[in-house]
């Protein structure tokens, strides 16, 4: 058993799933020009479970450690269980992260959830079909969606949060836009705070082509 420090070092020195995307996987990437770090996650699904996961990392050692820890945490999980995961579980698996390394867990969470959203957009939405025991809640991160989620849970039904990303204008205040990266993160935090799975489905390209620039 590794102690907290050695857990981080072990993932850096022997990363699980590095440069090993599963066949027929969907991808989710996070990072880019702002910090120079980039993490891409590849997921494959079988019988409602994550049966394959790998990643690539460009940047600091913490990014490799978070990608590796993500592989261990998510592989074999049911889709809804994976959609409950985030930076908190990653930081715990690595024994905590310093302020300088915490951004790596943020990028790993974002890459994971973009890949999960790509699974749904690619045709796996049937796994979230509404039933008497499950209700999809459109989450914006605001008060109304939070109350709706609580009411559904109070009825005894399983609430699953979904945020549709239709438009993102970097020239506007992201905190005031329902589709901005900040709003998506806020919606995910809300869902996870209520112990709900959360999915973000990125429909910006088809929305732009079909609605904004038809």
Model-derived features: where do they sit?
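Domain-level signature for proteins that mediate thiol-based redox and metal-cofactor handling
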Residues: 1-136, 150, 154, 161
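ATP-dependent adenylation/nucleotidyltransferase module used to activate substrates
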Residues: 125-214
């Amino acid at each position: 058993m590794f102690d907290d420090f050695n857990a981080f070092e072990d993932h850096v020195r022997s990363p699980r799933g590095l440069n090993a995307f599963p066949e027929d996987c969907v991808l989710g990437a996070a990072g880019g020009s702002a910090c120079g770090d980039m993490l891409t996650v590849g997921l494959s699904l079988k019988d409602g479970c994550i049966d394959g996961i790998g990643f690539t990392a460009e940047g600091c050692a913490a990014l490799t450690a978070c990608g590796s820890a993500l592989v261990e945490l998510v592989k074999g999980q049911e889709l809804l269980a994976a959609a409950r995961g985030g930076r908190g579980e990653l930081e715990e698996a690595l024994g905590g992260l310093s302020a300088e390394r915490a951004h790596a867990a943020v990028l790993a969470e974002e890459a994971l959830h973009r890949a999960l959203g790509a699974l749904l957009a690619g045709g796996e939405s049937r796994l979230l079909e509404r039933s008497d025991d499950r209700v999809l809640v459109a989450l914006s991160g605001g008060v109304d969606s939070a109350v709706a989620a609580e009411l559904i849970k109070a009825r005894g039904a399983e609430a699953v949060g979904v945020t549709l990303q239709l438009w993102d204008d970097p020239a506007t205040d992201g905190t005031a836009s329902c589709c901005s990266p900040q709003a998506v993160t806020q919606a995910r935090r809300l869902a996870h705070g209520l112990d709900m799975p959360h999915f973000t489905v990125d429909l910006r390209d088809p929305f732009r082509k079909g609605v904004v620039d038809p």
